[in-house]
Swiss-Prot record:
PANTHER family, per database record: PEROXIDE STRESS RESISTANCE PROTEIN YAAA (PTHR30283:SF4), PEROXIDE STRESS RESPONSE PROTEIN YAAA (PTHR30283)
HAMAP family xrefs: UPF0246
GO biological process: response to hydroperoxide
Protein name: UPF0246 protein VV1_0535
One Pfam family from the record: H2O2_YaaD
Lineage, top ranks: Bacteria, Pseudomonadati, Pseudomonadota, Gammaproteobacteria, Vibrionales
Stored InterPro entries: YaaA
Recorded family membership: Belongs to the UPF0246 family.
Gene Ontology CC terms: cytosol
Length: 258
């Protein structure tokens, strides 16, 4: 199975690296086109477009200016270690071993507004450009139009390379909208994580993001290859609820956290 996750806004380029293996991102020619557009933006443009503070806008204007076509361990780091945030807190990539990284390299992909699709060990320079950003570009008025079929085609290549036709969608709606499911050569299965709150089970964003990361780790660590085995996921108290699940949506619940 191939796992797809969202990226994170929070980045870490400081922590010691737990692996020195790296690969090069494959869609840099596209990233370059977006960087050229982003370099025309003023800090005020960035603040308004991304709905961020002046400080974050300044930081990202600087990142766009400093971005280089050459990706090296000096100006970039592996995507799976650079992304932080709730999904990556659940994934805990910094405690994976070399065999796990090799497995993830084949079975995990990260969607990205700037890089399109990243393998875990692909070098990534720091950026902020969410997929939902309404950035006018040579191909349209937003990033969904910019990426078109490119991400889906890359996913199809990865699906063939890893050996079956199952894609586990652990990405947010904002990011999975960049994928065209009808053009995917795969059965898409979306796990849903619901937490109890005041007697009701619902998707709580913070918990759901972390759970998506935990499930990605569960698949990687246990080399899960069947959907039946995926339903055994029980990290952090989640359990599979068969009667609420369908062939394409797996529902997991958890009792209230105190």
């Amino acid at each position: 199975m191939l796992i797809v996750v969202s990226p994170a806004k929070t980045l870490d380029y400081e922590s010691p690296l737990v692996t020195h293996k790296f690969t090069q991102p494959e869609l840099v020619d596209y990233s370059k086109q977006l960087i050229e557009v982003c370099r025309q933006l003023t800090p005020a443009d960035v603040a308004s477009l991304m709905k961020v503070s002046d400080k974050i806008a300044d930081l990202n204007v600087g990142r766009f200016q400093e971005w280089s076509e050459e990706f090296t361990p000096d100006n970039a780091r592996q995507a799976i270690l650079a992304f932080k945030g709730d999904v990556y807190t659940g994934l805990e990539a910094e405690t994976l071993n070399d065999d796990d990284f090799d497995y993830a390299q084949k079975h995990l992909r990260m969607l990205s507004g700037l890089y399109g699709l990243l393998k875990p060990l692909d070098l990534m320079q720091p950026y902020r450009l969410e997929m939902g950003t309404k950035l006018a570009n040579p191909k349209g008025s937003n990033l969904y139009q910019f990426w078109g079929n490119v991400i889906t085609e890359k996913l199809n290549e990865a699906i063939v390379a890893q050996g079956d036709n199952v894609l586990i969608n652990l990405a947010s709606n904002e990011y999975f909208k960049a994928v065209k499911p009808k053009a995917l050569d795969a059965q898409v299965i979306t796990p849903i994580f619901k937490d109890a709150k005041n007697g009701q089970y619902k998707v709580i964003s913070f918990f759901a993001k972390k759970a998506r990361g935990m499930m990605a780790r569960y698949i990687i660590e246990n080399r899960i290859s069947s959907v039946a085995d995926l339903t055994q996921f029980d990290s952090a108290g989640y359990y599979f609820v068969e009667e609420e699940s369908t062939p394409t949506e797996l529902v997991f619940k958890r009792e209230e956290q105190h």
